[in-house]
Design a protein with these regions (language model features):
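Phosphate-handling substructures
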Residues: 27, 66-127, 179
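Short active-site segment of divalent metal-dependent hydrolases/proteases
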Residues: 12, 151-152
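Acidic, low-complexity terminal tails and accessory targeting/binding regions
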Residues: 81-95, 157-210
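Short, well-ordered beta-to-alpha junction loops that form the rim of enzyme active sites
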Residues: 52-54, 77, 142-150, 157
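Extreme N-terminal starter segment of soluble prokaryotic enzymes
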Residues: 1-5
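Active-site signature of alpha/beta-hydrolase-fold catalytic machinery across serine-
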Residues: 63, 154, 158
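Glycine-rich phosphate-binding loop signature in dinucleotide/nucleotide-binding domains
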Residues: 43-45, 135-141
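Active-site-proximal alpha-helix that buttresses catalytic centers in soluble enzyme cores
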Residues: 7-74
Length: 210
């Protein structure tokens, strides 16, 4: 058996309602910086650390890496779903971004690209598939993966036996994701065999099962 730990990044400036930045450049908020420092004390010692290409995962992992002298390794397949192009949201706060996000999901087209630099849902699902089929077997037991909320929700969706290929699949996933609470700085345990991931569950803050 193998276990990995998925950590959603700490609160970002976007989570706190801030003005839009390019997705890869979004930093942590002041509250997120405190959450990251708390995680460094909570997580198990001396583990391999993997992050997405997004700044907020790097900043979340940084206190742990500094504490244990670990260098984070980048896994592009962990990148969050970036479905709104920066050109469409530049200068907007969270409230102003919301109707654009709702319109995207209501379209329910897995192959629709909203603009330059944006992902399609099919591409996003491909990243999660890459993680499940290629990356999982290669990762060492006990590794820490700092990632993102929608990504973790799609992983949970796929592990439950659901598909993410059609417009109906996409709409059903959105309803599932909207009802699944994945808090900033929460830690999730991903269990499976050496060949395949099987189950994902959230650990309580006082978990002693690392």
């Amino acid at each position: 058996m193998k276990t990995l730990y998925l950590i959603r990044h700490a609160q970002s400036a976007a989570n706190a309602g801030g003005i839009s930045l390019p997705d890869r450049e979004i930093p942590l908020s002041a509250a997120g910086t405190r959450q990251a420092a708390e995680l460094a004390c909570r997580l198990p010692e001396n583990r391999r650390v993997f992050v997405s290409e997004m700044r907020r995962t790097h900043e979340t992992a940084a206190p742990y890496c500094a504490r244990h002298g670990v260098r984070p390794e980048i896994l592009p397949c962990l990148n969050e779903f970036s479905y709104l192009p920066f050109a469409a949201v530049q200068g907007l706060d969270a409230a102003a971004r919301k109707p654009l996000a709702e319109a995207y999901w209501q379209r329910a087209d897995p192959h629709f690209r909203a603009g330059g630099g944006a992902d399609t849902f099919a591409e996003f699902d491909g990243r999660v598939s890459d993680f499940l089929h290629r990356v999982w077997p290669a990762l060492p037991h006990g590794s820490l993966l700092f990632g993102h909320g929608i990504w973790m929700a799609l992983l949970a969706w796929r592990l439950s036996g659901n598909r993410a290929e059609t417009g109906a699949d996409m709409a059903a996933f959105r309803a599932f994701q909207s009802s699944l609470h994945i808090a900033n700085a929460s830690v999730w345990r991903l269990d499976g065999t050496e060949a395949a991931a099987e189950s994902l569950r959230c650990l309580p803050e006082n978990a002693a099962e690392f």
